[in-house]
Amino acid sequence: MMMNLSSVDDLNKRLPRPIKPIQFRGGFYLKMDKNEPYAEDSYDWVKVGNEAVFRRVAPCRRCILPNINPETGERDPENNPLKTLKTYRCFENNPSPVLGIHLGLRQGGKIKRGDVVYVGVQK
C-alpha cells in the first residue's frame, strides 16, 4: 500500500488529535514536492528509483485497523481516524473510506529510502 503524506496531513487537519502515518501500516509513504492531498488516487503506475515499477491495483479501502495505535495497542475512543475519513472519503456507495492505493509489482528492482519516485496518470 502506498500513500501520499500530504493526504495524512490533510486528514490530520480534520481530526481532534493528529495521528502518525504509521497508523495506516503502509509499505510506501511519499513525500511530494507539491502539497497535493489524495493525488495518489489518480496514479496508474509508480516507478521507484531506476528499476522497480508498480501498477495501481485498487484504492485502499480502510478497515478499523488505523483506529488502533501500533505503538500503544490502544484503540481510539472516538473511532478515529476511520470516523472522520467516512465523512469525506467514501466512494461508489461503499461505506469503507479510501486512503492510499494498493500496488502490484510490474518490474522488480532495488529500492531505498530517498529514491526518486515517478508516477504515471492516464488522461
Residue ranges and their predicted role:
Residues M1-K123:
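Metal-cofactor-dependent catalytic cores
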